């Protein structure tokens, strides 16, 4: 896709009363498929010609809000960030890491890792009138080892990792109080009260079949309010 294709979609959406255009995966780094660029959170201006602010402003002129997809917790082996900091990925010392979905998981128990990724997110959100962020997390945690923790404290990593995610999202909603943050994890794998503290809605499921969604949302509604269930057209 490119800027003109996105604006064409936005024009059609505006005619049908849709209120927000969300730009999904593929807008950053050098990403043309799922094998590259997670961690390189800068705009690919070969696709987003004219820059992100121009695109967002043009979408806003059509009466639509603008949203964006990110997967801040992940890193691609084929990324500038991984080439600079291969030790930032979660891994057991002296073992080859497990690659899943062509990506590794960043060690968000480490402050320097959180700060680096957060600064990149902050720069993107500060550059344009972005109303919504879909924070995705698409793979399981494996190879649970941290190069920063001593051997007798490796068991703390999973807990410290989640606390790191919480800290980043706390900063996000503090710095951008009008932002709508939606959590997602391969669908609804993170639909829990901890994440709802930071995001008022969570992506309910990657199954968007209208009939199948009825059962999914009925079951989710036994515990959670309907307003918390995210769904896209």
Where are these regions (language model features)?
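Glycan-recognition surfaces
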Residues: 76-115, 159-233
